[in-house]
């Protein structure tokens, strides 16, 4: 939840994920994503943060608040690489919303799909997914932060970005193995 400045909770993640998965054509998947973003923007928490910033004349403030909550700064310019969603510089994204070319929902989605946002949240999201997938619960802060630190910085003989140790830790945890019996 880069836009909310916090980690998603298991109880909200599961129904959200159900909405975005399944046997969908590319067109259906795109429609589901657009509908999800529009619905997400109606949530009370989102409205409480951004409700007054969703009009074209508030585009710069909307982007600034998104950057603040996500803890990132969009680059001045950027290049879209093959396989990436379109990448926009900060001023270009503001211009697209302020001119009406992008709605607030399209601007939010474009922001979330920027490489700088992806890079800032990838390890955190990966760790949260291990808790959600293996342990079926929210992470406790200490364990979550420790795993994010290991992925980000490495530890001992574990190099940064080595997912094998993280996955091994979850698969061999007592909590996970007890899900399947004594």
Stretches found by the model and what they are:
Residues 1-182:
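Composition-driven recognition of low-complexity segments enriched
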């Amino acid at each position: 939840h880069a836009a909310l400045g916090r980690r998603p909770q298991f109880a909200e993640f599961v129904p959200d994920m159900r909405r975005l998965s399944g046997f969908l054509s590319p067109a259906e998947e795109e429609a589901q994503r657009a509908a999800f973003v529009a619905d997400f923007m109606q949530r009370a928490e989102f409205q409480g943060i951004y409700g007054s910033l969703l009009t074209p004349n508030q585009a710069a403030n909307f982007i600034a608040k998104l950057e603040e909550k996500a803890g990132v700064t969009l680059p001045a310019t950027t290049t879209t690489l093959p396989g990436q969603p379109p990448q926009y510089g900060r001023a270009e994204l503001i211009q697209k919303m302020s001119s009406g070319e992008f709605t607030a929902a399209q601007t939010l989605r474009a922001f979330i799909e920027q490489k700088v946002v992806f890079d800032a949240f990838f390890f955190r999201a990966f760790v949260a997914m291990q808790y959600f997938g293996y342990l079926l619960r929210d992470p406790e802060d200490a364990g979550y932060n420790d795993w994010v630190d290991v992925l980000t910085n490495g530890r001992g003989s574990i190099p940064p970005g080595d997912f094998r140790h993280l996955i091994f830790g979850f698969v061999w945890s007592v909590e996970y193995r007890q899900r399947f019996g004594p």
